[in-house]
Regions:
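Single conserved hydrophobic/aromatic residue that forms the stacking wall/gate
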Residues: 1-8, 12-13
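Active-site His/Glu-centered metal-binding helix of metallohydrolases
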Residues: 12, 124, 128, 218
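Internal mixed beta-strand/loop scaffold within catalytic domains of large alpha/beta enzymes
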Residues: 16-17, 25
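Charged, cofactor-coupling segments
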Residues: 23, 27-70, 130-247
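Long, K/E/R/D-enriched contiguous segments that form extended
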Residues: 43, 53, 57-102, 108, ...
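Functionally critical, mid-to-C-terminal surface segments that flank or help form catalytic/ligand
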Residues: 84-155, 159
Length: 247
């Protein structure tokens, strides 16, 4: 999947396509992977600056998402509840948005109110194996999923499906993102959601921003976890991406 401009902001929704022309100043989000000879899948996402250089606004948002991505990679370990990791990523994203003046209060309050789903209306990751989205229903059978579904519905979010405790041998994606989706912003604003937490006037300057997501694949080991690909990972930092696009 590839999206740019406002379509890039909707790349958290499946089956969005764009046949538009890339424009300087826009972002290009590429979510892709490959299947090996053993039929196991991979799934990666990078967000590139079309012009070869991120604007300062884009760089600010990108580095917030990268901080959440790296924190998740450091947290994944055997027997860790994946929802705890999901919420930790939300807190880092919230702290970054607060620092930019797009949200008010504390990160904890933003997460508790469900406000982060305005900016990342999808789960942090999914299981991966012979299918790109592998065994997603496991979380629904692992414990009382109805409670999780109820919490999600109250906050107006998607349902967090990856609710099981991760075990050695599990492969999960790590894919936080921040998206500025005009239709979703307008809906939450009209319904009076997240008053005192989201600064809707400040968001007006981001309506044409699009979205940023960073995704890698992580395998859980007996003692922790490691990123698949190791030091051969796809360029990921601002400098690395600008070097690739600017060639």
């Amino acid at each position: 999947e590839i999206g740019s401009g406002l379509v890039g902001s909707e790349m958290c929704i499946r089956d969005r396509h764009s046949d538009g022309v890339l424009q300087n100043g826009r972002l290009l989000l590429c979510d892709a992977g490959a299947e090996g000879l053993s039929y196991y899948c991979s799934d990666h996402t990078r967000t590139y600056p079309v012009s070869g250089k991120f604007t300062q606004k884009q760089k600010d948002i990108y580095n917030i998402v990268l901080a959440a991505h790296d924190r998740v990679a450091a947290m994944i370990a055997p027997h860790m509840p994946y929802m705890d990791i999901h919420n930790a990523s939300y807190r880092i994203l919230a702290e970054g948005l607060i620092s930019l003046g797009l949200m008010r209060g504390t990160a904890e309050d933003a997460v508790a109110a469900g406000a982060m789903t305005l900016f990342m209306p999808h789960g942090l990751g999914h299981g991966m194996g012979l299918d790109v989205h592998d065994c997603e229903a496991i979380g629904e059978r692992s414990f009382d999923f109805s409670e999780i579904a109820e919490q999600a519905a109250k906050s107006g979010t998607c349902i967090q499906r990856s609710t099981w405790r991760i075990e050695p041998g599990t492969v999960m994606t790590d894919e936080p993102g921040i998206y500025f989706i005009p239709a979703l912003i307008d809906k939450c604003r009209a319904e009076g959601k997240y008053k005192g937490i989201v600064d809707y006037e400040a968001l007006d300057a981001y309506r044409d921003f699009g979205g940023i997501r960073i995704e890698d694949d992580i395998i859980v080991t007996e003692t922790g976890s490691r990123m698949i690909g190791g030091d051969k990972r796809i360029p990921i930092t601002v400098d690395e991406l600008e070097a690739v696009v600017g060639r």
